[in-house]
Amino acid sequence: MEKGDTHILVFPFPSQGHINPLLQLSKRLIAKGIKVSLVTTLHVSNHLQLQGAYSNSVKIEVISDGSEDRLETDTMRQTLDRFRQKMTKNLEDFLQKAMVSSNPPKFILYDSTMPWVLEVAKEFGLDRAPFYTQSCALNSINYHVLHGQLKLPPETPTISLPSMPLLRPSDLPAYDFDPASTDTIIDLLTSQYSNIQDANLLFCNTFDKLEGEIIQWMETLGRPVKTVGPTVPSAYLDKRVENDKHYGLSLFKPNEDVCLKWLDSKPSGSVLYVSYGSLVEMGEEQLKELALGIKETGKFFLWVVRDTEAEKLPPNFVESVAEKGLVVSWCSQLEVLAHPSVGCFFTHCGWNSTLEALCLGVPVVAFPQWADQVTNAKFLEDVWKVGKRVKRNEQRLASKEEVRSCIWEVMEGERASEFKSNSMEWKKWAKEAVDEGGSSDKNIEEFVAMLKQT
């Protein structure tokens, strides 16, 4: 790294869904002349696959996260406390050397779930900003929980928040998936807003057209808000960032060739793509209902079932659907969603998957499991109007009939053309946001100009 180059640190939370958005923003900053050092853990660095110019442009700085000291008996709070303590100390040690190097960093951009990074940055006189990997709608909900203006679970049948549609309790993020850790999870997610008054900027992985009113509300919190999303590889949007077709980090090995060859043989818009992310674990009864519902649609389908989940499928399921379905352990989701054969995405509604569906113009069947997925599903169905949300019964089970009905309605029903038309509109608006002169591109340009002036 040459002396005098404008240099920043990027510090993501060490999980795939948090690293990839910050990596994508880093690529756009590099394309505009900024030098980036990515601070991460050894485990993550071993899985990074930066291609072309980015393999040289992003300097990887590895620090310990304390995971080697973790005990199996540790609670989530104990694990997070150790992570914070270890990472704080190691970040301080790293910065003591970096700040006296020939080209010290001017700025640190960090994952919002690690607000303690801001305090370390202040110690060293570094300008700083949190990066929110989630939607601004979730930011609003968590902020109001932090300040005691909203309780989880809520005490009223409807919830009214500034610049948000009217919400029901079933639209709020579900943080009770691990009852023993609910309080810890809520503390972690609401702490993202505990010290924002000391941040220079707030970066959000969204775009103005998608969440404009909520973004305006965030700006009332007193710090400038920079929307820089969607953080999807440029090849699928504006194509202005060279050699940017993949995120650069995958903790799973995709069956890319198998999936794409199979899709090539199917008619346009005929395939249902099913994936519920890298973390969700589904109960055996629910997975069985899901499998039967998918099978009974008679649709071609590509289903990602991780190896750890495959044993929950009904006996001989894979063999029984061989003519219609392909079941794989992982795939390149962007490649699949961009394929013309795919007509619907059955998704858990993680924010990255939500953005990918919108960016690639694919209607959805929303099947959220926990956390922000629930709120994302609400917006996909009722605000952005690109699909249907699966309903559960009193036992919190989605029946095979409900699964089949939702898939059929999105792909063949009366509103199928509406869902597709709306999806294509969002695809256009997402591309416009990151293209030259778009809202997100302008925000990135302004940030780069600010860095070069200081």
From Swiss-Prot:
Keywords: Disulfide bond, Glycosyltransferase, Transferase. The keyword Transmembrane helix does not apply. Transmembrane segments: none annotated. Highly expressed in young fruits 15 days after anthesis (15-DAA). S.cerevisiae missing EXG1 but transformed to express S.grosvenorii optimized UGT74AC1 (UGTMG1) and UGT94-289-3 (UGTMS1-M7) cultured with mogrol and glucose accumulates mogrosides I-E, II-E, III-A and IV-A as a result of mogrol multi-glycosylation. An anthocyanidin binds at residues 18, 144, 371. It holds the Pfam family UDPGT. Optimum temperature is 50 degrees Celsius. CDD domains: GT1_Gtf-like. UDP-alpha-D-glucose binds at residues 278, 331, 333, 351-353, 356, 372-373. Its EC number is 2.4.1.350. UDP-glycosyltransferase involved in the biosynthesis of cucurbitacin and mogroside tetracyclic triterpene natural products (e.g. siamenoside I and mogrosides IV, V and VI). Cucurbitacins have cytotoxic properties and exhibit deterrent taste as a defense barrier against herbivores. Mogrosides are nonsugar highly oxygenated compounds used as high-intensity zero-calorie sweeteners; they also possess pharmacological properties such as regulating immunity, lowering blood sugar and lipid levels, protecting the liver, and acting as antioxidants and antitumor agents. This is Mogroside I-E synthase. It comes from Siraitia grosvenorii (Monk's fruit). The gene is UGT74AC1.
